[in-house]
Amino acid sequence: MEIIKNINTGQLKEIISNRYPYLLIDFALEIVPGVRAKAYKNMSANEWFFAVHFPEEPMMPGMLQVEAMLQTLSLTVLSLRENQGGQIRCCSADKIRLKKHVVPGMRLDIEAELVSYENGVAKGSVIGRIGNEEACSAQFTFEVKS
C-alpha cells in the first residue's frame, strides 16, 4: 500500500486544483491513495475570512470548514494515478455537524476516509478536530472528472 507523507502547499497544488484564497488546507500529513488522508489548516489571524466573518469575534465560516473537509477527502481519490490532474464536483454533503468555533490561533486537523469509489463517484466521511475535540464532520458524495 502506497503512503504519501508530508505534502506541502506546493505539492498539494499538484494534486488538487484549488488555489488561494480557496485552498483551505495548508499541509497533508498523510495520503493513502484510495483509502484515507490527514491534513490540517492553521488559523492565522491574517486569514482573509476572519476580517469579514464577525470581525469583533472572528471565526472560520462553517461552509469553509465544510470545503476544507471536502478538499481533504478529495486527496484520497485525486492522488490515484488514473485521476492525476482531475477535478471533483460535489454531489452531496450530508450529516454536516459544526460543533466548535474555529478561531485564529487554532489548527484544524482533518481526517478523511474514503468509503467507496466506483465509476467515478466517491463517497467518504470526514472529521475535523481542534486538539482532541471534534469541531466539524460531514459525509460527502462527489464525482471525479479526469
Question: Where do the PLM segments sit?
Answer:
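Conserved positions in beta-strands of structured domains
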Residues: 26-29, 94, 99, 113-115
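HotDog/MaoC-like acyl-thioester-processing domains
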Residues: 2-4, 34, 103-106, 113-146
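Hydrophobic beta-strand-centered segment that forms part of the acyl-chain substrate-binding groove
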Residues: 2-6, 72-109, 137-143
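Flexible, low-complexity linker/boundary loops enriched in proline and small hydrophobic residues
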Residues: 3-29
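Active-site helix/loop of acyl-thioester processing domains in fatty-acid/polyketide metabolism
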Residues: 28, 60-83
